[in-house]
Amino acid sequence: MSGPTYDRKIPGISTDLSGSMSCHPTSKDSPTLPESSATDMGYYSSHHEYYQSPPYPQQMNSYHQFNLSGMGATPGAYPTKTEYPYNTYRQYGHFNRDLQTPPQSAVKEEPETEVRMVNGKPKKIRKPRTIYSSYQLAALQRRFQKAQYLALPERAELAAQLGLTQTQVKIWFQNRRSKFKKLYKNGEVPLEHSPNASDSMACNSPPSPAVWDNNAHSSQVNRGQIPQPPLSSTPPYMEDYSNHWYQQGSHLQHPVHHPGPPQSVGAVY
């Protein structure tokens, strides 16, 4: 093994090992690797802190101020934010009160507009009177003869037919009733309201029994004629009494209808 061949192999192996070691240097031969890695880590860490660390505290602070604006947050940080909802609420409530108060005052001032000062004295202004046409007056008069009081559907229908409002129809009927009562009380009922004029208001009550009916029946009994029952309908409980009264009248007719022969004075004495 100590021959020339072995000596030649050893330098070849050493050269191969040195070549391989030169291709793959160790950490001791390359001192820049740790420094570069350290600088790279510091560079990236500094940028990471620069881009990430400021936003999080800012967002947390803003979120904290937003949520705790009215719950003991740092005073003076956002004065407009803490007072904005309260001021808005106060302004909104004040605005609502301003909107609600004018209708009340307007309602109170409505009667004052109808009062006018005449010679230093307040005088109420009367509304203009409604002028009815001849057709409307004739239709209202005909309806008044049928009924003095109208129901709501009837009043609405009549107002629609005549082109009037329901208030105008109601006021006309009220005035007409008061006028009729006044004339009837004074005994000055006009001809149009007489019973012969087919006025239902004058004939609303059932006809009273005539006074001469009893006299007529008594005269018929005296003349011996059987009285006939009247054509007017009578209640059922009155029929028995009337039949009994008629039968009594028929018994009374014999002594009246067949009187005895007159006796002369000479025959008696």
Swiss-Prot record:
Which CDD domains does the UniProt record give?
A: homeodomain (cd00086)
Question: From the UniProt annotation, which stretches of this protein bind DNA?
Answer: 125-184
Organ and tissue specificity: Expressed in the developing forebrain and fins.
- Keyword Coiled coil belongs to the record: no
Under InterPro entries, the record lists: Distal-less_Homeobox_TF, Distal-less_N, HD, HD_metazoa, Homeobox_CS, Homeodomain-like_sf, HTH_motif
DNA-binding among keywords? yes
Which residues are connected by disulfide bridges in this protein? none
Stretches of Polar residues bias are at 15-39, 195-205, 215-225
Q: Name one GO cellular component term.
A: nucleus
Return the Basic and acidic residues bias intervals: 1-10
Q: Name one Pfam family in it.
A: DLL_N
- What are the start and end residues of every segment in region (Disordered)? 1-41, 191-242, 250-269
Keyword terms, alphabetized: Developmental protein, DNA-binding, Homeobox, Nucleus
Instruction: Report the PROSITE patterns cross-referenced here.
Output: HOMEOBOX_1, HOMEOBOX_2
Q: Which family does it belong to?
A: Belongs to the distal-less homeobox family.
Function comment: Involved in the development of the inner ear.
Q: What is this protein called?
A: Homeobox protein Dlx3b
Species this chain originates from: Danio rerio (Zebrafish)
